[in-house]
């Protein structure tokens, strides 16, 4: 009897350690068309994976246009999903509006944006940490260069954390580094980025920070063409791993681990600890990183990204994650002077 009682106690303890299966719980994910967009596939894969842990039903609502975003939020609320998770900046407006009118039993969360609502759990990122790491990588990979390029989408406060982080990272290795900026004024048109990359190479840049979303393809294409002329330039991708075997000039990518973020949100939801308001995720959370440094990549250019360079970069990433290196960004761009050439 004692043996049976002991086994029963162990069985009860084991059951207590297993997450409760959420029978009847439903999660809706609202996002752009997923396709092969790794920024979104990470989220979908995490939602699928955790469904096996928590036992919830889920639905992915893909939105190719503005009308579909509104319709998807309307449908998710009408169908009484328990957690409505929006991915991307487009979700902020709709999540905030629906949270203001929906029943309190429906929870709202967004990834990579701030809904600015006390009815929504907003998850954004300290992108300056990743940008600093990319800047340090540029310095370690090209220690004899002093001119560095940056191509972004739009000028303004939204991109300051990227520009500041990158510049400070470069200067931590190359103190007399200078920088030149160009902006595509688009999230998706590669043509301006292509032209700017060639212009920046002509100005003396070997390394160009690719901060222009899908426009970065223009930088990557320019790098391939310039290489045929013996004028090598190197760059990085954004958000997801953009390294590839057919383009050795893409050295790394500044990562936003959206799958990790989705996991944090869903775990908190089922633990009853999901809090509304803004949550800013960092390198220490595993939500910010870089290909070949904090995460494996598709393709490695070992001639530039040597073991020594990678080790130096990993030391920087570890210092940021541990809090040994604290990045104190100025309150505004007016409080910082870029060494522009």
Language model region names:
Residues 22-341:
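A residue-level marker of the well-folded mature domains of exported/periplasmic proteins
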